[in-house]
Amino acid sequence: MPLGAVQRFRQKMERFPALVPLLTQGDSWFAFPTLLRANIIDTLVKQNEGQAAWLRLEGLLSNGQDVRQMLSGKGYLEMQRILSDPTLKFAGILVSGGGNDIIGRALLSLLNESTEGMTWMDGINLVRFERRLQAIENAYHELADLRDDHQAEAYIFTHAYDFPTPGNKPWRIGLMKVGPWMKPHMDRKGITDAESQRAIMTFMLKRLDELMQKFEQQRDRVVYVRTQSTLTDQEWDDEMHPTSKGFQKLAALFQAALRRTFPKLSQR
């Protein structure tokens, strides 16, 4: 992240100390290109204009990033540097991560080869999947540890996505296309039944929901924003990304959580 962004955030808080200072880090649900449609954070920034200051660690390259990357190696060191800076104080830390840990090429190793008579549940390599969930959980606890060490009063806001429908539609930008991220990998394993594919992804996302509930219960000042069962089938633009209306609905859930936690934010 450019140092200029940190300096601008610092100067803004010096000029307007009543603003609610917020730090964000995340995948495409926070970093989807603004020129195509406003993502969750874009929407929140607009809704809270004049009431919150934002330091955004995510950028265009964050699309496709998994939470294990965000909280390890260079990602961990960047988060540590920001949170430990005595000149920076945050009321909230918003994080979107975990989805890319279980879809795309990351999904392939979590599936078993299809065999005759196999149920959709048999298609999941549960040992590997539970190990992956543990890695996701560990990453979030690393974040909470950093928060406790350096920004003890800050709240962490998380979510667990929504239930996608595996399909053939990629994300297109001009002549470039990216994805799909689920169906091709399931097809490669011989899991070709549409209902089985959807059941597998629903199961995995429900387990992620359980993980986030547990994280919220185990750590202080964690707000788990319940986003599952929010989007209709028509509010998905592709396998992974909501439409503009979908992003707006998800942002409304975050806005409500922010207002409950920080009453000084307006009711708009």
Label each residue range with its predicted role.
Residues 1-21:
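Short N-terminal or domain-adjacent regulatory/targeting segments
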Residues 21-23, 31-129:
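Conserved SGNH/GDSL esterase-like catalytic core that processes O-acyl groups on lipids
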Residues 31-33, 101-105, 164-170, 231-235:
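Short catalytic/ligand-binding loop motif for oxyanion handling, primarily in non-cytosolic enzymes
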Residues 60-64, 222-235:
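Acidic carboxylate-rich catalytic motifs and surrounding loops in phosphoryl-/glycosyl-chemistry enzymes
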Residues 116-138, 143, 194-201:
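Surface-exposed cleft-lining segments at the edges of enzyme active sites
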Residues 132-181:
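Hydrophobic, aromatic-enriched interface-forming segments
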Residues 167-223:
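Substrate-gating cap/lid alpha-helix
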Residues 235-268:
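Histidine-centered active-site loop/cap adjacent to the catalytic His
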